[in-house]
Amino acid sequence: MAFSYRTPQEELLSRLPQSQQEAISGFQYERFQKEEEKKVENFSFYLPEKTREWFTKSGVYLSPFAYVNHSHPGCKTLENHLLFNVVASYISKYSYVACLSIKSNKMSKMERLGSNSVKTYDILNRLVTAKDKARYGPLARPERSPCPKKTNIFIHDEIHYWSRDQLETFLQVHRPKNLWATLVFPPEILAGYKSSVLPFLYQFEIHGKDLVYMPDGVRSESYTQPLENGFLLSSSSILVRNKATGVEIRYQVSLVYSLGSHHLFHIYPTEDLMKEEVRRFGPYDLFDVGSLFVKPVRVPIQDFPLSVFKKIFIYLSSLKKPDVQSAVAKLRQLSDADISIESVFMVQEFASRVEKNGVGSWSCSFWECMKDWFFDKLPYREVLEKIGLANDFTRRLMKIKPLAFDIHTTDRPLTVRMVIDQIWGERQSSCDDVPNIIFYGRKEWLEHGLLPKVKKGLAKLVPGRETGGSDYPEEIYSDLLSSTSIWRSYDENLRHRKASPIVILKSEKAYSEAPGFSSNCISLCSTPFGEVIERTPFEVERERKKRELSFGCLDFHIRKMKVKDASELSIKLDEQNKEGLRRQKRKEKAKKTRMIPVHLLELGSDQKEKNLGQEASKGKGIEQEERRKSDEAKFDSGPSGVCSIKAENPVDAQHIAEPVPCLKLNDLIGKEKICSSGLIKTVGNDYLTLARQIEDMPLAQLKNRKAAYFCIDYPMVYFHDKISYPTFEATGEIKQIIMRARDKWGANFNSALIQVYNDGCRLPLHSDNEECYDDDEILTINVVGDAKFHTTCHGEIIDLRQGDEILMPGGYQKMNKHAVEVASEGRTSVTLRVHKRDFSFESKLRFIKGKFDCLFVSIAEIIHKKPEEVMMFIPHIVDRCVSNRGCSLDDARAICEKYEIKIECEGDCGLVECGTIGLSVGRMLLRGNHFTVASVRRSSMDSLANSSKELKSNGVLDHVMFNFHKRLRSVEPDLTVEEIKVDSSRAGKLLKSLMDGMTGIVSHNSTHEGWRMIKGINSTSEMRSFMSMIKGKSEETRGDLFDRVQELNFMKVKIYGIFGFAGSGKSHAIQNLIQTEFKGSQGVMVICPRRFLAKDWSEKGVDEKDIKTFESALKSDVKGKRLFILDEISLLPKGFTDLLMLKMHMEGILKKSTIVCIGDPLQAGYFCPKDDNYLSREGEIKRLFKDGVNYKWYSYRINKFIAKKLAIETMNDFIGIDEQNLIYKDMPSAHHFMENKGNHIEVILVPSMIEKELYSNYGNVMTFGESQGLTFNCGVIVLSEEAKLCSDAHIMVAITRFRRGFCFALGSKGSKEDYMRSMKSGLLQRMCSGIGASKEFILGSSSVKLILSEKDVSKGAGVDEMDREARLEGDVWLKSMIYLGKRYHIVEPLGQVIKLTENAIKCHIPVCSSQTLGPELDNIQAREFREFKGKNGWSNQFREEAGPNWKHPYRVNQAMSYEAIYPRHRMDDDLTFLAAIKKRLRFDNVANNYAKFKAAESRGKYLAKVFLRHVPIKCGRDQRLLDQCRQEFEETKLSKSAATIGAHSQRSDSDWPLDKIFLFMKSQLCTKFEKRFTEAKAGQTLACFPHKILVEFSPWCRYTEKVLTANLPDNYYIHQRKNFSELEDFAKRFSNGSMCVESDYTAFDVSQDHTILAFEVELLKHFGWDDKVLQSYIKMKCTLGCRLGGFAIMRFTGEFSTFLFNTLANMVFTFCRYEVPDGTPICFAGDDMCALRNLREIDTHECILSKLSLKAKVNRTKVPMFCGWRLCFDGLIKEPCLIYERLQVAIENGRLMDVIDSYFLEFSFAYKLGERLYSHLEIEQLNYHQVLTRFFIRNKHLLRGDSRHNISELEWLSDEDSDDDKGSQIEDRRRGYSNCWGEKLQNLF
């Protein structure tokens, strides 16, 4: 992300020395000074920002010191630009100019324009409007002074008051040589636009026949002019008749310059020049609102800025729930203060449509296409849309483009028609009266335009009165003349349209010519002149039909143009034909100069422009003799160097249409004629250089050979049969070979096929007749090796040796074939051909279809288009697909960028985003070089979760749920799909069992009205009949019920299944899908056999009333449901799925619904003793999925111990509890030992209900079956006699319920050994004995085949792919900046670290009461002496009353609370914020910042050298480390919760300017030791940067930090990303109790000025930063600002890597200020510095230090402090009073639980020093330390985690006597959090 593009000149200039830059800038200054001096008077008006921007983009000079006020400055500036910049440059070329309607002062200014000054002129003014009297002075008269004739005239802003007749009269009388005229007329009026396209510059209104023009929208400055007098904009010439001589003179009208509504015309007598046929205007940053909202709205608005509209639309599309309020807020953000009310209403209307109906999709289904087609054919569709009966909003939205229109010119005053661009459509041009009035005049328009139109419309309403259709031949479809009216065909420019030519066949003879021969070589077998072959009857008949068709076309055009014959038609169209010929010649010339693929060319000019006149003028009677004479004449006048041979008879002459080049002697030397067919061979050529180049070429491996295809100018695709070749542009030696062959053989070779063969390779007989070639010459060069060349023109075999060439002449391929046999390994050939054209699209399609088109098919499916449409839209991708035999991810990206869509592609390399615009529309899978569609994004209709209200539209519900399985496939890779028929007998058995009360408890027919389960049954008797019917025992064979039941026999239903091991996440994917996309939906029903499972589903977004047991599901109304989830399907009664489908079918929803089954075949199934003998024997899973299921063979739940016993992989890293798998003698023993080890028993699992009652007093007790589907941490499994009888499935349920582990407890008499001996062989026996179960044993217990899907549990292979997208849902802008593909983590090798531990010393601390510490509070001053004071009050840093959370008794005066010791900063404290701004910020402008930085570059280099002298770092960049840093940054960014990321999404807004920050103040309690009892302190400012800045720079900063850390000498310590244990080790290693030095900096952040920036830039260059990133960093530092203004160069807290750059500045300052010998230990942390030796100050670098803003006070002490810690040779000590006072503040505010752990860890560093503490602390601090010790010992129960463990280790060291040495070493303590310092040191990026 570079901030701006830099040209090579700018790059060079930035690298030049300062003096040279100043020299170059001096030239620019002088030029600028002259420019300003000349134009300041006319271009210094103060303009609004938008107007200034528009003028600048339009190329108008504006003075940078604009201060002059004016009523309409925009139009005044535009007028001055037109007069003094444009007009003056033209009229100054003439020696004399007569000036009309211009004030004298303007002309006097024109005299002083230097080279463009007007020399000699006269001013001839007259009074036209009422204001002209005041404008021109008292001498002006209504009549004009005599104007000289035949001279140069300039008319300023008067001609728009003249009618066309007046202008013609003026030209007729004065006959000027050149007439220059300025015109003010909005051109958009001629396009039918009713409001200004540049409303900030001018506005207008139309009142009848008048136009009211308002400059700058100022109504008081408006003036009125005739509306019809804008005719000049559509006039190409004016015809004037001389009354005296009667001679007509044509004046050309040329629009020389046009800007906004001001135009300059040049009118002069016609010369033979090309006319202006079309005048183009635009594009404007507008779109027609009326074209989007066809339905009438109350808002009178026609235009709206398109750039703003696009941003609003993209923003709404990026929101999950777009709403009107968000759209209006976005409008306000994007607009200035002047927002029209109409714009607000328009945005509200648009947003409400998007919110209500969505936008629709880019493509549509077949039925939607049919609907659109039908809608387009409606005769009154505009009316239907206006009255709201039809809506085509989406298609209109897609067609929105910037406003641009064309005006077609003409020289006919009454037949001018406006041809408007397609953006408006013909509908508007024919219906809009304003342009027609301008063109025709009011009278003519009413008579000739309006009345015929009304008559034509009325004729359509009367049957039989329609105008007759054209009699144009039906075989011709491409001629536009056949479908247009006479006036349109006459006036409209059709030369750019593809029209059918007029065909006249002149030959009466049935002869076919033999192919001619053209070659540079003599051939003995060329066709003799005059030889003809008689045509076949088929050819004769075809030519006859062509001739008849041609004559039919000609007759139609003659009648249509109302002429007598073809000669008159030729005269009438002659003018167009001349221009057409010129255009055709230019196009043909351009085509010859360079060959490019067909999709980069325009349509051929020969198809666009046909010389209709010349062909038509020949008529039907033209004989063959005339054609022959014409051909002879062309032939005789051929170019020199071509033999002109004249035939003796007319027949012979027909065959000499092409010139035969003359042969020269040099062309025949060294050539051998092989046969009479013209085959020529040369020998002895040297191609060694070419052979060496071919060895390095990227040739593709084909069968028995390698090959590649080269073309001059552009790589053309080439393929044949099933083979394609990679194509490249011919360069170097290849190109030279082609060019030399051109000269040598006289053939226009442009392509080369290079092939390297294997020995023995054979190419059978073939012809090089692909469609890309004509029958031209082909030259084969045998570069290396030997081969045999065989042809069909003679029987001999030609031997080819190294350096041989063989030429097949033109025409050879039609009659002969050739073959090649390679005789040596590595034989290399180069075949030169004339590649005439690209392959047709049909040929390319045939080649790739079904083999290489998977990418096009996939994208077409996602965007709902045909693959062929995608291919035609991006033809160059098709070419790459052909050449590469397939597509790549780059091709996918290119297609997405062309369509402006985003598609995700998941492949072996991870998830990749293709495209950058909008949200993802779908996802593709790339597996084995094959693209497939994984999912298609649902449209806005597809969400079931749009509302919690009940859905009334079943159409929307059906559409969504019918496609639910597609969404499920995309999130569940192990989905099993099976198509089954409903088993009516199976359903009938379960239904009868329910009716009879054998199954269930609430479905009995008599007591619970079970007959209500089936729709259409109203009584018990009807239910009995229905059951007989579905069993096939009923005699009834008619009726609705019978018919519906019979329909089931012809239906197959798809069933979806998700199966896996216990804890494998079977329901995770579908629950997440419901939670994110279908939460609160009324269309989902979940059927759960356990109430515990139901609670889990309700928490995941399913309404509780939609979670049913199997009985309540059968009895409920399912008509509104479309998704049925059967959880733990193995626990459902046998036949339930069939009965459910039967019920759904009876209610008419079976075809529209999706059924998903979730379960585990290895776990327990349904069992009920009542119905076990009646229901079917086959379980539900085996019934539905006979062929097997995809099975998740892994678990996230069970620990590693159990996973090993079951031979399965687990994601749970916990090994298992110590009691795992132990068998205790009874339940009390198990309970005691489990609880003693801290393993809380959450559940006791028993095999039967009797035992459940028996153990109920121990807590939560469940049977094995009841626990199925649930998860616990720890528990006990009871081993009783009942457990021996349980199946392996039930045992599997029991042992897989626990995350941490379980133990067994005997529940029967006897010992463990007795129980084990009586146990049968099975899963329980294997687990109790410790043997475990093999994979085969477990799989063998399944009722169906399991297709295992194992999971890769190795760390680092894309661990967080799914999490990243979910995390970024709330910030869609940030999602586009984060890499969402697969990540690879480098696993560092583990090594054994041996750490020596010290013995702790016991100590007894004297007792000290906390009351003795109270008097220190007397140091608190009164608040009035401490606060900042301002005019409006005090600051609010010190509290005088208890806080709202103070829940403890007031032990002290509230004004003397512990919080009052320290100043507190709050965001709402204005005075503190102002003090922060005054102290911590500096302001300056951008120019000064850049200038200071440039001046400091040499000092920066000096400082960098000093730094690198002390910290040697190798120059260069480690790209792998940089990539790793970028990955770490993104992972850190995404480690926050989704809610936190979403809350900061405004920072990702792309509209946030990169040079603006949001400034605020940090809220904190300043608990530093030096802040105790002080006065108020200035706040700490924080800067909030946009995410785009952080995403760009933070990876580079991380990289810099890692490189610095890796190269840092051991004696330097930087406290970044380290815990205080490492600082402790450093202090122990280097402290020796000597004098230490500390630097106390003042205003450190503000002092990071231009010199420090120059130092950073030089250092970062050395680190290997990319130059673009560096330039962006410099620009950011120099241009940064906020609402307060622009900042000077400084550091901000909150800036990326603030700590790192502060540390670097700290280090270089230290190296310059002090003499630092090698090995001196120094600690650095931001602005904190502590040297553990006594350093001497030096003045060696004083020349640099004196120019630094950074200053420091030098402190020398024997008690060094660093980051708030005392450093000593025994370790670290935190000031005990600080910890105590912070604890008291936390107690006062009720926050003790939040901070006690971190404060204890700080305290423990001092406490573990034991008796050694006395030598480092004063008596006052020791008292605080003793009070803290008592506090933490007494409150150890409040500690958590490691703190709780550590306090037990330290406890024995205090006041207890014990010989039990538990080991006093505390290893790897981590500091955690340390209030203000911790906040300061945290990584800010």
From Swiss-Prot:
Disordered: annotated span: 607-639
Segments forming domain (+)RNA virus helicase C-terminal: 1193-1337
Residues holding ATP: G1060, F1061, A1062, G1063, S1064, G1065, K1066, S1067
UniProtKB keywords: ATP-binding, Helicase, Hydrolase, Nucleotide-binding, Nucleotidyltransferase, RNA-directed RNA polymerase, Transferase, Viral RNA replication
Domain called Alphavirus-like MT: residue spans: 63-239
Cysteines joined through disulfide linkages: none
Domain Fe2OG dioxygenase span(s) in chain numbering: 748-836
Keyword Ligase: no
Coiled-coil regions listed in the entry: none
Record-linked SUPFAM superfamilies: Clavaminate synthase-like, DNA/RNA polymerases, P-loop containing nucleoside triphosphate hydrolases
Reactions the enzyme catalyzes: RNA(n) + a ribonucleoside 5'-triphosphate = RNA(n+1) + diphosphate
First-tier enzyme category under EC: transferase
Biased composition (Basic and acidic residues): 607-635
Domain (+)RNA virus helicase ATP-binding, first and last residues per copy: 1027-1192
GO MF, one annotated term: RNA-directed RNA polymerase activity
Gene Ontology terms: biological process: DNA-templated transcription; mRNA modification; RNA processing; viral RNA genome replication
The protein's Enzyme Commission number: 2.7.7.48
Domain RdRp catalytic per the UniProt entry, residue ranges: 1634-1741
Biological function: Involved in viral RNA replication.
Protein name in the entry: RNA-directed RNA polymerase
Lineage: Viruses, Riboviria, Orthornavirae, Kitrinoviricota, Alsuviricetes
